[in-house]
Amino acid sequence: MSIVRSSVHAKWVVGKVIGTAMIKTAKVRATRLVLDPYLLKYFNKRKTYFAHDALQQCSVGDIVLLRALPVPRSKHVKHELAEIIFKVGRVIDPVTGKPCAGTAYLESPLSEPREELKVS
């Protein structure tokens, strides 16, 4: 009886695309918090993953979800692009559903109330 094991520990990874120079491959950086046992303080720990992007649909700055491959595609590529969570520059507030830039909502001119024309 053989058990298929993944070659990586992280099955699902959320990270930011930092490079797309390689063909059909995205370079993704994931950040997680690690507790220092002596200081009892959390510090950021970054790890870089290479993910297979078959359609070459992601660009630098996108927030993406990666899925671990059961068998690595190459020495470094062990994940594949599962989903683009947020495209760069197109951030939607999850509570209101409105597009935003930083802490301000982007209002389109069509969504503002218009004044009625008075006919005399």
UniProtKB/Swiss-Prot annotation:
Molecular functions (GO terms): rRNA binding; structural constituent of ribosome
One example of a Gene Ontology biological process annotation: mitochondrial translation
InterPro entries found in the cross-reference section: NA-bd_OB-fold (IPR012340), Ribosomal_uS17 (IPR000266), Ribosomal_uS17m_metazoa (IPR039193)
The organism's place on the tree of life at top rank: Eukaryota
Subcellular location: Mitochondrion
Keywords on record: Mitochondrion, Ribonucleoprotein, Ribosomal protein, RNA-binding, rRNA-binding, Transit peptide
Principal location: mitochondrion
Signal peptide: none
GO (cellular component) term, any one: mitochondrial inner membrane
Transit peptide per record: 1-20
Assembly information from the UniProt record: Component of the mitochondrial ribosome small subunit (28S) which comprises a 12S rRNA and about 30 distinct proteins.
Family of this protein: Belongs to the universal ribosomal protein uS17 family.
Name listed for the protein in its UniProt record: Small ribosomal subunit protein uS17m
UniProt organism field: Mus musculus
Classification lineage: Eukaryota, Metazoa, Chordata, Craniata, Vertebrata
Gene expressing this chain: Mrps17
